[in-house]
C-alpha cells in the first residue's frame, strides 16, 4: 500500500478521467 499523496492524486485523477470518458 502506497502512502504517497501524489500517487493517490494521480490515481484519483485517472479514475475521474476514465469516468468522464465512459460517459
UniProtKB/Swiss-Prot annotation:
Signal peptide: none
GO biological process, one term: pyrroloquinoline quinone biosynthetic process
Pathway per the UniProt entry: Cofactor biosynthesis; pyrroloquinoline quinone biosynthesis
Source species, domain of life: Bacteria
Residues forming coiled coils: none
Keyword ATP-binding: no
Cross-link annotation Pyrroloquinoline quinone (Glu-Tyr), location: 15-19
Keywords of the record: PQQ biosynthesis
Purpose of the protein: Required for coenzyme pyrroloquinoline quinone (PQQ) biosynthesis. PQQ is probably formed by cross-linking a specific glutamate to a specific tyrosine residue and excising these residues from the peptide.
Family the UniProt entry places it in: Belongs to the PqqA family.
HAMAP family: PQQ_syn_PqqA (MF_00656)
NCBIfam families attached to this UniProt entry: PQQ_syn_pqqA
UniProt name for this protein: Coenzyme PQQ synthesis protein A
Organism: Pseudomonas aeruginosa (strain ATCC 15692 / DSM 22644 / CIP 104116 / JCM 14847 / LMG 12228 / 1C / PRS 101 / PAO1)
Record gene name: pqqA
